């Protein structure tokens, strides 16, 4: 359905096909990650909360509604974003709350390591797992990322590099 919707958008002459990005929240984020590896016509991606390594994800493995598939390898190959993210060559921003109870910042980091394109991260303190959009407490950082990536606007803050000596953290801001 995502690719079909994208086809509808790019067929509309009023829409600039070079400025279409995709975001998804929670399970929509999982679908965003899969799409990032298969539809190169999107110019940017912003998965919020969800990522790959689904069978290791607390929101999947610790819930009663999911039973482990009979053929784990085949299931991962078909349905887990880790099978697709290594083909992602567009800018992608992974966003998650540090206190998210469904998805893991660590697994999101491991998912982002698979991507070929430029990768950004937005780790938010006290961003609980919810689905609000563009407001003061919502997903304004997704809007900022898309504005920067698609329209060249300045990001509020980008960390260029970081290092730690075990006691102190040094961060270089771009």
Where are these predicted regions, by residue range?
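Alpha/beta-hydrolase active-site loop
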Residues: 1-13, 76
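Alpha/beta-hydrolase fold nucleophile elbow
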Residues: 14-26
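Short beta-strand immediately N-terminal to the catalytic nucleophile in serine-hydrolase-like folds
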Residues: 22-24, 48, 95
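Hydrolase active-site cap/lid region
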Residues: 31-74, 122-126, 130-140
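Active-site nucleophile elbow and catalytic-triad environment of alpha/beta-hydrolase enzymes
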Residues: 70-84
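Short beta-strand/loop motif that positions the catalytic acidic residue
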Residues: 88, 94-96, 100
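Conserved alpha/beta-hydrolase "acid-adjacent" motif
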Residues: 101-107
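Surface beta-strand/loop "capping" patches
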Residues: 144-174
């Amino acid at each position: 359905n995502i690719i079909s919707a994208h086809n509808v958008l790019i067929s509309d002459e009023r829409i600039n096909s070079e400025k279409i990005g995709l975001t998804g929240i929670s399970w929509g984020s999982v679908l965003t990650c899969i799409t990032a590896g298969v539809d190169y016509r999107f110019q940017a991606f912003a998965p919020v909360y969800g990522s790959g390594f689904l069978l290791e994800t607390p929101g999947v493995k610790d819930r009663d509604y999911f039973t482990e598939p009979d053929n784990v390898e085949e299931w991962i190959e078909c349905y887990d974003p880790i099978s697709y993210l290594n083909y992602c060559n567009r800018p992608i921003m992974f966003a998650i709350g540090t206190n998210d109870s469904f998805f893991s910042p660590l697994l999101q980091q491991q998912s982002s390591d698979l991507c070929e394109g430029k990768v950004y991260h937005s780790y938010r303190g006290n961003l609980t797992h919810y689905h609000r959009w563009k407001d003061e407490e919502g997903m304004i950082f997704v809007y900022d990322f898309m504005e920067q990536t698609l329209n060249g606007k300045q990001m509020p803050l980008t960390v260029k590099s970081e290092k730690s000596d075990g006691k102190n953290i040094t961060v270089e801001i771009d």
